[in-house]
From Swiss-Prot:
Keywords: Isomerase. This is Ribose-5-phosphate isomerase A. The active site is at residue 105. CDD domains: RPI_A (cd01398). Homodimer. Substrate binds at residues 28-31, 83-86, 96-99, 123. It catalyses: aldehydo-D-ribose 5-phosphate = D-ribulose 5-phosphate. It holds the Pfam family Rib_5-P_isom_A. It comes from Methylobacterium radiotolerans (strain ATCC 27329 / DSM 1819 / JCM 2831 / NBRC 15690 / NCIMB 10815 / 0-1). NCBIfam families: PRK00702.1, rpiA. One of its GO terms (biological process) is pentose-phosphate shunt, non-oxidative branch. One of its GO terms (molecular function) is ribose-5-phosphate isomerase activity.
Length: 237
């Protein structure tokens, strides 16, 4: 069973949580895109919801599927956000931001009554950190901020390197908000809360990809005997 099949299985389970009239946060990334695709099918069948996208890519996909959209200013309180994750641990702490949408993803998730993560079960880890931690930064004073982020990482008991994320042409990747991304390749994060606090203390940091105390549940899909087996961390209610 392929990765797309597992993503679709997790997304299908999340779709069961959607009720008519809901205000939904729509995540970013391949697994979130699978959910948006299924949501579009339900909308075409008559489901009435409004979605708030977390990126321009998600906005474009949702619009192409006929999903009614609003901005977060128009719908500042959401019922549910469905989004993917790069890593999730047993305490529902996440690393997100591989798709460079972490700032909007976190804003939307925190404006929601509930956030549910959907992912391939391979994203479930004992300790966060194998996936590079994205840190969104202001372009102004980039070198100074880069050095300060490296110091913050070391001060939080982590080791590794911090690299500016680049596009294929070698130029810095620019987020939808006009910021850059520093990827902290740490291997393991012994204390995510300490690292999050240390990164927040750096003036040039706009947001980091540690989502702590935000997710209510994670729907994880794994291949078993040629079928998708879906399990849940946390509570879906």
């Amino acid at each position: 069973m392929s990765g797309p099949d597992l993503r679709r299985a997790a997304a299908a389970r999340a779709l069961d949580l959607v009720e008519p009239g809901m205000r939904l946060g729509l995540g970013t990334g391949s697994t979130a895109a699978a959910f948006v695709a299924l949501l579009g099918e339900r909308v075409r069948a008559g489901l009435d919801i409004v979605g708030v996208p977390t990126s321009e890519a998600t906005r474009a996909q949702a619009e192409s599927l006929g999903i009614r959209l609003a901005t977060l200013d128009e719908q500042p309180e959401l019922d549910l956000t469905i989004d993917g994750a790069d890593e999730v641990d047993d305490r529902l702490r996440l690393i997100k931001g591989g798709g460079a949408a972490l700032l909007r993803e976190k804003i939307v998730a925190c404006a929601s009554r509930r956030m549910v993560v959907i992912a391939d079960a391979a994203k479930h880890v004992a300790r966060l950190g194998a996936f590079p931690l994205p840190v969104e930064v202001n372009p102004f004073g980039l070198k100074a901020t880069h050095r300060a982020v490296e110091a913050a990482v070391a001060g939080a008991g982590c080791s590794g390197d911090v690299r500016l994320r680049a596009q294929a042409d070698g130029k810095p990747l620019v987020t939808d908000g006009g910021h850059y991304i520093l990827d902290a390749r740490l291997g393991a994060i012994p204390d995510p809360e300490a690292l999050g606090a240390a990164l927040w203390a750096v003036p040039g940091v706009v947001e980091h990809g540690l989502f702590l105390g935000i997710a209510d549940a994670a729907i994880l899909a794994a291949a078993r005997d040629g079928q998708a087996e879906v399990t849940v961390l946390g509570s879906l209610t």
